[in-house]
Amino acid sequence: MALNKSMHPRNRYKDKPPDFAYLASKYPEFKQHVNVNLAGRVSLNFKDPCAVRALTCTLLKEDFGLTIDIPLERLIPTVPLRLNYIHWVEDLINYHDSDKTALRRGIDIGTGASCIYPLLGATLNGWYFLATEVDDICYNYAKKNVEQNNLSDLIKVVKVPQKTLLMDALKEESEIIYDFCMCNPPFFANQLEAQGVNSRNPHRSPPSSVNTGGITEIMAEGGELEFVKRIIHDSLKLKKRLRWYSCMLGKKCSLAPLKEELRLQGVPKVAHTEFYQGRTMRWALAWSFYEEVIIPNPPKKRKLEKPRKPMVFTVLESVIKLLTEKLPSGSEVPESITLVADCIKKILTDLKVQHKIVPCGRDEESLFLTAVENSWIHIRRKKRDRTRQLRELPRAPNDFLQSNKPDALHKETSDQGQNSGDPPATKESESVTQSETCVPHTSSTPESAAPALSEPMEAENSDSKPDEVCNNDEEQDLGEDMKQSCGEASSAPQGSGSPFLFKCVLNVKKENSDVLVEMHCVEGQNRDLMNQLCTYIRNQIYRLATS
């Protein structure tokens, strides 16, 4: 279940996720980690730490102009998630509605090897950061990343003793008021919890990405709950030295007890939010001792979108045998999947539903369908209507037809042209085609035939179905001519601005001795039409087998 639609509204990846194909074409170091399947779809193995690191470094380079190095044995941050946190801090300090020239100061508790929060905050907003770190490897990489991006004037990386949070870090800068602090605390209390042995619901699927964090980055005594409580206790001493204290949580169950702790301590302002990105969800908590600060609006309740199930029907083995018997004698008998797929292609061609073969896995056939008009509903009724309308077509009187003998044709037409100025009369087959079928033209027939001709033509125009008025032996050609001459619109939905009714992928696959047909909706609002087409295809396959 992808959560990108619920990202922070200012997150650049909300509506435009990273284009792996483009990034691979531009960055060779990223290209070596990209996989391309038979359908041409580009993907990345998020369980490979080298691939995750390549993606993070490539996104920072492409979208923010930042060059960083991250060791594989330390935490590799994902850019969209960190960007969500930065944007929420902007909301907390009312950054976009205030004087942007004023210097904003922040603290990043446990900045990590990437130093990603200070790098993003300084690059996007020009914020000043005090970044603390307890791990030697992370500290050295963080300093290097700041220096190679020429941000030493805005970011100060400080090595602090173990278990140092805010109090010891601010001893040397006792006069400075900071606007905020950020923290991505260690989520787990022990190794078993970090591996998901005793903390993860057994019904949940395993994580989709790899965890490369070091011991100090992913584990702390008491887990994230106790870690954040220590920050709360530091804030009770520092109080208004910081306008906002904040932290990000990896477990929803940590949020309620921490909010209760803040309530018990009498903290006046508390805010929380949720971060969505990819298949990952995080929670954030912030509190302030300033009465005048404005709390951002809480996140809206997110409606979970249930995945749409495909429309499915099964072609039984007995039906497949009947279809095989219909094949011409002596022809090669195809596989059951191919046989059913060929039947479906013929049905779609007869319906004029656009379709093309798309790459798929073994023992499977896939078609991409684009339906631009509803050509499968009420087909039998349409045939009856055409037959009825053929019987109602006006015919010229017998005396008029007899007067059009070949010997007298030229003389008769010239006399009519001289006397009345009317155009020459033509044969019946010509009078039914082209202009007369679209617009009643009474001057080419005697007055006695005019009422009979105009009445059915008005009915045709009111129904907008002139292509249904045709002879049995010329039905197809006449219908096409009439569509061209009358300029009839297609059956696509009017006023919607969409040139199609729906798009879907049709899969034909083996299921034991039967064949399974699935239709997956790709685009289009009306699933009823797709359901109608699915039912029609199923019924036609049965008719082909039993006819």
From Swiss-Prot:
Locations listed in the record: Nucleus; Cytoplasm
GO MF terms, alphabetically ordered: mRNA m(6)A methyltransferase activity; RNA binding; RNA stem-loop binding; U6 snRNA (adenine-(43)-N(6))-methyltransferase activity; U6 snRNA 3'-end binding
Top EC group: transferase
Regulation: Methyltransferase activity is autoinhibited by the K-loop region that blocks S-adenosyl-L-methionine-binding. Upon activation, K-loop changes conformation, allowing S-adenosyl-L-methionine-binding and subsequent methyltransferase activity. mRNA N6-adenosine-methyltransferase activity is inhibited by zinc.
Catalysed reactions, semicolon-separated: adenosine in U6 snRNA + S-adenosyl-L-methionine = N(6)-methyladenosine in U6 snRNA + S-adenosyl-L-homocysteine + H(+); an adenosine in mRNA + S-adenosyl-L-methionine = an N(6)-methyladenosine in mRNA + S-adenosyl-L-homocysteine + H(+)
Chain segments carrying region VCR 2: 500-547
A GO cellular component annotation in the UniProt record: cytoplasm
Membrane-spanning segments: none
EC number: 2.1.1.348, 2.1.1.346
Composition bias, Polar residues: 431-447
Key words of the record: Cytoplasm, Methyltransferase, Nucleus, RNA-binding, S-adenosyl-L-methionine, Transferase
Source domain of life: Eukaryota
InterPro entries: METTL16/PsiM, METTL16/RlmF, SAM-dependent_MTases_sf
K-loop: annotated span: 163-167
SUPFAM superfamilies: S-adenosyl-L-methionine-dependent methyltransferases
Region (Disordered): 383-473
Main subcellular localisation: nucleus
RNA-binding: region residues: 17-20, 199-211, 250-254, 277-283
Function: RNA N6-methyltransferase that methylates adenosine residues at the N(6) position of a subset of RNAs and is involved in S-adenosyl-L-methionine homeostasis by regulating expression of MAT2A transcripts. Able to N6-methylate a subset of mRNAs and U6 small nuclear RNAs (U6 snRNAs). In contrast to the METTL3-METTL14 heterodimer, only able to methylate a limited number of RNAs: requires both a 5'UACAGAGAA-3' nonamer sequence and a specific RNA structure.
Family that this chain belongs to: Belongs to the methyltransferase superfamily. METTL16/RlmF family.
Annotated domain remarks: The VCR (vertebrate conserved) regions bind the first hairpin of MAT2A mRNAs. The VCR regions interact with the internal stem-loop within U6 snRNAs, inducing the conformational rearrangement of the A43-containing region of U6 snRNA, thereby modifying the RNA structure to become suitable for productive catalysis by the methyltransferase region. The K-loop region occludes the S-adenosyl-L-methionine-binding pocket. Upon activation, conformation of the K-loop changes, allowing S-adenosyl-L-methionine-binding.
Protein name listed in UniProt: RNA N(6)-adenosine-methyltransferase mettl16
Organism: Xenopus laevis
